[in-house]
Amino acid sequence: MKTEDLTAYAKQKESVEKEITSCLLSINNKMEECYSGLSDNYQDFFQNYADMLYKLEIKKEYYSLLLEETEKSDLETIQAYMMDVISTLTQELIEIKIGSSCVGGMKHLAAVLEFEAKLELLVKFTELACNIDI
């Protein structure tokens, strides 16, 4: 690779890492807001924050794993990892959609929240994967 190609490659990898780090920072900040609501009033927490916190926990797990992959891999491997996650998320969304109608109230609520979180992850991971120019 030429020097300018290596520089562009490094900048692109750095850009991907910054995007993921930014998402994790935003998630952590929102989680702190949720936890602060917990100490004030439990009823208010469950009415206004619990669903958001559940979705944030799901997203944090996926972004943390992606950041680990980004720190140790090249762009091609990162993109392949994201495509694998996209495929897995798509399959899980189908399974959640089919299975959520067959469960009780609380499990249904959890399935709906998981569906929403994973749908948002699917969109973001697809966007990130498509922005990698190899």
What spans do the regions from the language model cover?
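Secondary-structure edge/capping motif, primarily at the C-terminal ends of alpha-helices
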Residues: K30-F45, T70, I96-V103
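Short, charged, amphipathic alpha-helical segments
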Residues: Q43-I58, M106-E120
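Amphipathic alpha-helical binding modules
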Residues: T90-I134
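Residue preference for a single heptad-register face of alpha-helical coiled-coils
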Residues: A8, Q12-S15, N41, N48, ...
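Short amphipathic alpha-helical heptad-repeat segments
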Residues: Y9-S36, L56-K59, I78-I98
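Intrinsic disorder/low-complexity detector
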Residues: K2-Y9, L66-D84
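Repeat-associated, polar segments at repeat-unit boundaries in modular proteins
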Residues: L53-L75, L122-D133
